[in-house]
Amino acid sequence: MARKKDPAVLTLDRTLQARTVQGKLCEKLEGGRVRCVACGHRCVILDGLDGICRVRFNHGGTLHVPRGYVAGLQVDPTEKKPFFHAFPGAVALSFGMLGCDFHCGYCQNWLTSQALRDVSALSPPRDVAPEEIVAIAKRHRAPVMVSTYNEPLITSEWAVEVFALARMEGITCGYVSNGNGTPEVLEFIRPHVDLYKVDLKGFRDASYRQLGGKLDNVLRTIERLHAMGFWVEIVTLLVPGFNDSREELRDIASFVASVSRDIPWHVTAFHQDYKMLDTADTTARDLMRAADLGFEAGLRYVYAGNLPGRVGDLENTRCPQCRTLLVERFGYRILHYRLADDGRCPSCHSTIAGFWRSGWKIPEMDGGLPGRVPRSVPIPAAQILPIGGQFGEEAGVPPDRRSASRRRGIRSFRPS
């Protein structure tokens, strides 16, 4: 049965429709249909409708995709992403748009990811040019730039446009993603993206379907990412009663090890958020138990996150050969750093897996203790979009483009 969309969501929808360009990650089909290949859903979209992500739509047989705004823009420690084996102690310029192809009930970025589904989820979008984003990164001396907050795969055309300029300035770029990719989108972003964090949300297909995805597609994406030479780190948010059984965690760890024992696996603590307000928070003991399973599976780098100072040695990086402490952390803070700038252990000279840049030195802070904390980046108020303005003028799309289907609340995609 068709669901009627809340008027406030419709208003946001109209605001975003003007900020689009013709998509590249698609295939034209007969009858004015298009197949989108930006994510694993591979939506076949009829003229006048949109995909499951609700931000990529078909108008006149042409796929339109988001461009020219951000809903989140912040300077973060790289450890927050988390990337523990790339530019330790640095900051990353993080940006994101709106929308997601999943609908996780425990999403910790739901204000951006679910804005097109949930009237209570809204981060006001702000007009911004790619050049402005790169200039902000340079101003904050950020060697890393990351597309995050919403699902970056569904806004890959925009990310690539920004990253192309960033790379010209020597900035390394990355994705923080659910991993629901396709071979086409990975080939599209590969020239511009070096770092890729995947949320592996569990190891049961039934659970993945509750979230709006399929387990096998995420697993194949992880395998492709590693084979294509991306630096991959994997995060599993431990949700009590959902994905924290010993058997499931062992399966996750074994899979990651089968791809590469050098892939860092982060097990992180769930806290009550969005629609899951009755589930107990993850304990430090739960994280340490999960980490033990990772080491038992043969993984060399296993970390526990979101509970700083409560998980023993599991925030730190040690040499897997001689066990020398290389990076000591407390949350996002680096307390001690001994890794050579070429990524080698100073004691046994073993190479530590990671994305290391020759000549990289950890930023010097007062007392040698980098205490960088996330901070939002201000954008002039004039660039905050007035929700509900006339749509379509920039893209040349008439304001009544799909008003009929929207008023009826018709579901707007068909699986291929």
Where in this protein do the model-derived segments appear?
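Auxiliary Fe-S-binding modules of radical SAM enzymes
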Residues: A2-D47, R246-S416
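Short recognition patches in nucleic-acid-associated and regulatory proteins
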Residues: I52-V55, G61-P66, L326-I334
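Conserved Radical SAM active-site core
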Residues: N58-L195, P363-R372
